[in-house]
Swiss-Prot record:
Gene name linked to the record: dsbD
Subcellular location: Cell inner membrane
Record lineage: Bacteria, Pseudomonadati, Pseudomonadota, Gammaproteobacteria, Enterobacterales
PROSITE patterns (UniProt xref): THIOREDOXIN_1, THIOREDOXIN_2
Organism encoding this protein: Shigella dysenteriae serotype 1 (strain Sd197)
Bilayer topology: Multi-pass membrane protein
Protein known as: Thiol:disulfide interchange protein DsbD
Major location (coarse): membrane
Amino acid sequence: MAQRIFTLILLLCSTSVFAGLFDAPGRSQFVPADQAFTFDFQQNQHDLNLTWQIKDGYYLYRKQIRITPEHAKIADVQLPQGVWHEDEFYGKSEIYRDRLTLPVTINQASAGATLTVTYQGCADAGFCYPPETKTVPLSEVVANNAAPQPVSVPQQEQPTAQLPFSALWALLIGIGIAFTPCVLPMYPLISGIVLGGKQRLSTARALLLTFIYVQGMALTYTALGLVVAAAGLQFQAALQHPYVLIGLAIVFTLLAMSMFGLFTLQLPSSLQTRLTLMSNRQQGGSPGGVFVMGAIAGLICSPCTTAPLSAILLYIAQSGNMWLGGGTLYLYALGMGLPLMLITVFGNRLLPKSGPWMEQVKTAFGFVILALPVFLLERVIGDIWGLRLWSALGVAFFGGAFITSLQAKRGWMRVVQIILLAAALVSVRPLQDWAFGATHTAQTQTHLNFTQIKTVDELNQALVEAKGKPVMLDLYADWCVACKEFEKYTFSDPQVQKALADTVLLQANVTANDAQDVALLKHLNVLGLPTILFFDGQGQEHPQARVTGFMDAETFSAHLRDRQP
């Protein structure tokens, strides 16, 4: 009886399910690409459907899907919108989860025509697969003289671009714009017009009329926000193109320059005059007339409000979110209207005295607008150059504010000057590192010294030349996020470097995924990246020491102590 029980225990422990319970971290728990992304197709004359069944915990990159016809003509393929995914190294990318159905219209296909489909995906656990290529055989299709009908693409979950600033900032910006030289002096006049020249209104009545005026103005701005966000939703893919991002960055920079006084940006004077006449025809003191006056006022942009309004409109177009677009502009208008409501109720005694400080407020908003092109360019030029741009902007803002504050004579301004100077010195650090090469030197000192190999023959030769030393082979690719995490966080750790001091370090860069790369991965039986292999002094791999997926420095150091031959 005891022998039977012992045999049963051995049988259970030998199965893959129970054996998986004893796998150490880093052992492969990932399925092959064909199981992670099950690909299928179905053709019915001119209509071809490509489908991917995506395993839970995995995703496909939208930008990595490519379709190339051979001896066939197809209509333009419109990829459905995905969901946003963000990582430290590549920023935001659109991805597909669960299931993707892609309809393709075949305009004409000769006998033997094919469709080459390339795609690539990753696992949430930080494991990426090389690009997969499938060949789809096409049935013969005779060209149809009629114009092909546009392909109806099923929409997946709408992506919402994550913007770096909350919509609530629009409220603060609106309040700040109210204190610029083009707006603040006009509030007493506007208050009188809204009340219809009546001085003996109750506080509640005056507040109600002013609130209605602000809501009319807010309605105009909200409508603008909805229209721009809807347009951004239609052109969301185009708005993420590097050339478009660079163009928008230039526009934002020009808008900021107008806030610095380099030129004046406003509606044509003839249009402003016409809108003003329409507003003057309305009857002040009545709710209906006041509402129309506010709605028209939202269209009359002064030189101080045109640039911020244009910047906010272009900014929310990046989101493609109509709720965010309308809400942002509503809060912006509400912020501009709050000082007007206070003046109407409490009178001019709440207004600060006009002076040069209003120009400084206008200049400060120019720097706020300048932050937007930096945010956009960061997606194109990468994190390192993005940090340098933020550094330059910080130095310009805090340095300029410090120089301006030197004109102040009040004692408490000395504390402000010290804070501004300290902020400028902190901001300049990335530029200092770049100028004097500090960052490069540090990186050079912390990187492992890998010997690059490309082919199976080069690997075998390197194993022979190791002369009895243990060997570690790191398989790397630019499209592998976890590979970059290994490089930045794990291989730079002093404990890891010390543990690998007597190990021959090899690295194969398979970014190109060419025939040699594919042959090497197949020879090593590698499903995807990151994968790190360990060989003993005789050139034999230790499969139990193989690492798939990211390990931090502490875990990897423990793995080296326990597993490395």
